[in-house]
Amino acid sequence: MGQQLLRRFKGYGCSMIGACRVVAYAEDVVVILNSPLGCAHILRDRELERNYQATNAMRGMFNSIGRRIVYTNLTNDDCIYGSGKKLAAAIGLVVELYNPAYILVVNSCMVGIIGDDIEAVAAEAEAACKVPVLAINSFGFMNGAYSNGFKLAVSIILSRFCTIQEKQDDTIVIIAPFEGKHSAAFRTVKQYLCFLGMKKVILFPGAASLEEIKLLCTCRYGIIIDHNNMLATDYEAAAEVLHERLGIQILDYADPAGFKETLSWLGKIHTALQSPESSYKMLREQLKQQYSQIINDFLAVAGKGNTVSIVIRDAKVILNFTWLNELLDDLQIEVEGIYIDRDNAMANGNVLDTLLYDVPRLSSIERFYLTVEEISLRLDGKN
């Protein structure tokens, strides 16, 4: 299991979820699910809502109502008479309540079965409301799964809002499944790129505003990051579309793991972007100082030659742990035990498999499957 099988479990869900993912963290769009209540529950309350709420603390929005996702609540009668009237009413209500930059109508398999002309409804509503309305005929599983909806939404959005323009050397797009602009991963990469001379860093698919989407055609370069994510194949497909449609040059390097690989990765980016040598050297020096400070701070607390424990609990994603080899060497410490929360054994077990694959020296370390409370007592020396 773990990292080696990760891509096997890429998005085989409904294509509606894939289409919605393209704008999952965008602030200025409203998604209308033209679907029955069941589809809306899965999409709104379980998938996108969960991901968005996870970022609220970073956004300072602890009481946020979440993403602006509405649904038409299609019924059996709508199977007979069509969904057009409900959808038109929903579009009008969304414009009145939210005043979005644009609206994304994501259609369910029910709409595909009855054959509604959703493009015509969207065009008529757009003319009346003066707001762009894009219809995504994802149709659930009728025309494929998650990946198909994702690619379709990317293609339609680019076709509608992007035209070939003069390239700007200081505008770049990040093509990565980061959890929005407020995620630590995006903020870190953006900081590096701005240091190298980028003035506009766009995260697409996923979080770009309409203004940023229109700027995609000015990007000379795009960077693919996070190849180990289960959505990596979908984002690589999006990169191909960006290259073919807009002529964006895609920089696709192996994800860095650890300090030395990060410096090497930044060197490749620096060379490709032809950024100022002085800026690159200054960034390298700053990162070296930060890493040295981390090492010194840890040794000041733990001391050289001491042992540490690794605790795996409440795992949500499978990570790349190869950086741990470098850190253990630089700290000159040994791992005395690996503690796994047994109440979440399956997910934590997948993470453990990846950890042992990436850091072979840990294969012989004793493992303890305990509750969180038992782990705390053991590490506190109380049991």
Each language-model region and where it sits:
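An N-terminal assembly and electron-transfer interface module characteristic of large anaerobic redox
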Residues: M1-N383
